[in-house]
Regions:
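Flexible, glycine/small-residue-enriched loop-and-beta-strand segment within the central core
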Residues: 1-15, 22-125, 153, 160-161, ...
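Short, basic, low-complexity termini and linkers enriched in Ser/Thr/Gly/Pro
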Residues: 1, 180-183
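C-terminal/domain-terminus segments
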Residues: 125-148
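Hydrophobic residues at beta-strand termini and immediately following loops
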Residues: 149, 157
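Short, low-complexity intrinsically disordered segments enriched in A/P/G/S/L with frequent Arg
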Residues: 168, 172, 176, 180-181
Length: 183
């Protein structure tokens, strides 16, 4: 594991793969991080979360217990995963909730998916392989493989196509040809 700065970071009981890179001011505990994953500053990853290999988790993101990111997942800045759809401070008797009162739901983000900055991913969701969640989206239900979803709530926009080789997409990005002219 390589780090830029451990100052004011809490890293406890974490299983790290090879060549993991962590930037400062993180809170990681009881989770697993796969090989060659990059974790930005001000990220929290809770116990029981599993992060695959070659993932990128951008700054200020929150990954809670019960979340699994498969290999090659991108998480933009300020993404929040939720593992309880009906959170309450107190139980039915008015006492502060304990672990026994809490019902955690799991979330799975499959290989190669990308989640745009500022998105919120509710619990009990599966985001399919190579799916793209647009920035600022609120994902309330499963996202199919290769789907592009956006909005609040997130809705299907279209599907990613495999007709264009990846190299051609990167070439268009370098030249700026992917941008529409301003009207």
């Amino acid at each position: 594991m390589e780090n830029q700065d451990y100052f004011c970071s809490v890293i406890r009981d974490v299983k790290f793969g090879e060549n993991v890179k962590i930037y400062g001011f993180v809170n990681l505990y009881g989770c697993e991080i796969g090989d060659c994953t990059r974790i930005g500053a001000f990220v929290e990853i809770q116990k029981g979360a599993n992060i695959g290999a070659n993932c990128k988790i951008s700054s200020h993101s929150f990954i809670c217990e019960g979340v699994t990111l498969e290999d090659g997942v991108f998480v933009g800045h300020q993404v929040a995963f939720i593992n309880d759809r009906y959170p309450r401070a107190t139980n039915a008797t008015g006492q502060l909730q304990s672990e026994q009162d809490w019902f955690m739901e799991r979330t799975l983000v499959k290989r190669g998916a990308s989640i745009g900055s500022g998105s919120v991913i509710l619990s009990n969701i599966t985001i399919g392989e190579n799916a793209i969640v647009g920035a600022g989206s609120v994902v309330t239900k499963d996202v199919p493989a290769n789907a592009i979803v956006a909005g609040n709530p997130a809705r299907l926009i279209r599907y990613v196509t495999t007709e264009e080789p990846v190299a051609a997409v990167y070439e268009r990005r370098k030249t700026g040809a992917h941008r529409a002219p301003l009207q």
